[in-house]
């Protein structure tokens, strides 16, 4: 399929998408909010007073939802390589999480072992080739996991986008060695043809 036809199909699906319409009606910045909401409704991940980091935050759907759930208490830091409009009670870092100086800026904001929850919806720019895209995506997951291991408090939780493919089983195994509970979720708002799923790891063990 040509890129033009593929783009047209995506646009048509986007405008017909029930979650796009729902997000617009409810004032959310993106349909992705319903992926987090579905998981949070089942797992009660986000509570007032928490310290939360949201990686790959733009345009801000997940951050917006987390901010609402935290009710103005706690600390919420969002980071993305793309700009994001300001949200109440949110500290935003504009930068590439893969770069050391950006990572250090984030670390400087949050004392070590005080992080309650790491959220990551990071994904690379997709080329359409799984051989290229999956390794790039898994690298971002590995970086998020490394950050979580350094910053989460005992009992802390992590929710990260992860893609089926090379390295998937190894990362799940690694998570199970560090957390009390690890499950894979495919929210209803995640498009069925997408290889994305979400790894939920609860109860971090130091």
From Swiss-Prot:
GO terms for cellular component: cytoplasm. It catalyses: uridine(2552) in 23S rRNA + S-adenosyl-L-methionine = 2'-O-methyluridine(2552) in 23S rRNA + S-adenosyl-L-homocysteine + H(+). Transmembrane segments: none annotated. Its main location: cytoplasm. Keywords: Cytoplasm, Methyltransferase, rRNA processing, S-adenosyl-L-methionine, Transferase. The active site is at residue 161. S-adenosyl-L-methionine binds at residues 60, 62, 80, 96, 121. SUPFAM superfamilies: S-adenosyl-L-methionine-dependent methyltransferases (SSF53335). It is found in: Cytoplasm. Disulfide bonds: none annotated. The keyword Lipid metabolism does not apply. Its EC number is 2.1.1.166. GO terms for molecular function: rRNA (uridine-2'-O-)-methyltransferase activity. NCBIfam families: PRK11188.1. Specifically methylates the uridine in position 2552 of 23S rRNA at the 2'-O position of the ribose in the fully assembled 50S ribosomal subunit. Belongs to the class I-like SAM-binding methyltransferase superfamily. RNA methyltransferase RlmE family. This is Ribosomal RNA large subunit methyltransferase E. It comes from Legionella pneumophila (strain Corby). The lineage of its organism: Bacteria, Pseudomonadati, Pseudomonadota, Gammaproteobacteria, Legionellales.
């Amino acid at each position: 399929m040509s890129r033009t036809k593929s783009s047209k199909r995506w646009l048509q699906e986007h405008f017909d998408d029930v979650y796009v319409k729902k997000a617009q009606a409810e004032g959310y910045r993106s349909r992705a909010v319903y992926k987090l909401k579905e998981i949070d409704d089942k797992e009660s991940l986000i509570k007032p007073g928490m310290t939360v980091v949201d990686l790959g935050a733009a345009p801000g759907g997940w951050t917006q939802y987390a901010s609402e759930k935290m009710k103005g208490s706690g600390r919420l830091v969002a980071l993305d390589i793309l700009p994001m409009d300001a949200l109440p009670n949110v500290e935003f870092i504009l930068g590439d999480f893969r770069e050391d100086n950006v990572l250090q800026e984030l670390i400087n904001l949050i004392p070590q072992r005080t992080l309650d929850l790491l959220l990551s919806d990071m994904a690379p720019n997709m080329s359409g080739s799984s051989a290229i895209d999956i390794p790039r995506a898994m690298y971002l997951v590995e970086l998020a996991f490394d950050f979580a291991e350094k910053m989460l408090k005992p009992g802390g939780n992590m929710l990260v986008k992860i893609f089926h493919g090379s390295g998937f089983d190894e990362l799940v195994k690694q998570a199970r060695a560090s957390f009390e509970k690890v499950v894979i979720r495919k929210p209803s708002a995640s498009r069925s043809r997408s290889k994305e799923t979400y790894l939920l790891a609860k109860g971090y063990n130091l």
